[in-house]
Amino acid sequence: MRNDTLNDVINSIKNASRLGRREIIAEPAAKLIGKVLKVMQDYNYIKSFEVIDESRGGKFKIVLNTTINNCGVIKPRFPVKNENLEKYESRYLPAEDFGILILTTTKGVMSNIEARKLGIGGKLLAYVY
């Protein structure tokens, strides 16, 4: 039984990137994982992803870029106000304007850059750089 499917997908992306693999198959195809992958695609951390619709949950086929240095899931999922985002950026990212935090907000899943522009906070999900 899996406890954190987002963690499984992020770790498989990190391991495949370190091994130099170009594509991976990750399961299950959950909505939250798809939205996190979309944010990663928007910032060119992955080239593309698609849902392979099979029975029992489905799978994602993810095509990787070589630009991922590190990525991980943030646990526990801290609720963060917009004015406190900088504190978590310095904690999880190596330098200013290098990498993104992925958070879920009332407006959907987005990066810390978009959340700061909209002036909203949310719960931290993951970091990528």
Swiss-Prot record:
This is Small ribosomal subunit protein uS8. It holds the Pfam family Ribosomal_S8. One of its GO terms (cellular component) is ribosome. GO terms for biological process: translation. It comes from the Archaea. Disulfide bonds: none annotated. Signal peptide: none annotated.
